[in-house]
Amino acid sequence: MKKTLVIHPTDPTTDFLKPIYEGRGFTEVTTDFQSDQLKERIQNHDRVIMLGHGYHHGLLHYIKPVIDESFVSLLKQKELVGIWCFAKSFFDAHGLTGFHTD
């Protein structure tokens, strides 16, 4: 079975996305986005689901970047789902594949 990591920064305005992953046995990261630890978690999973608010340059936790171009080399090796505003721009700019929103 593939190991799935969910990165969904805590934000009550995106709680409606929780049914996508809750109760499925996925590893969930909703707080504590230290870059080195997050990269290690990504490396140890086959699939990465990224949810929340974002912009052209990646996924945000309020105004702080959580996923940005420094993660691209790791993400290219994974099955990806990106659900945030402008996820398509981020995926396209970095040659990432997978399901993503516009």
Predicted regions and their residues:
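A domain-level signal for caspase-like cysteine endopeptidase catalytic cores
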Residues: 1-49, 81-82, 87
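Catalytic cores of nucleophile-dependent amide-cleaving enzymes
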Residues: 47-102
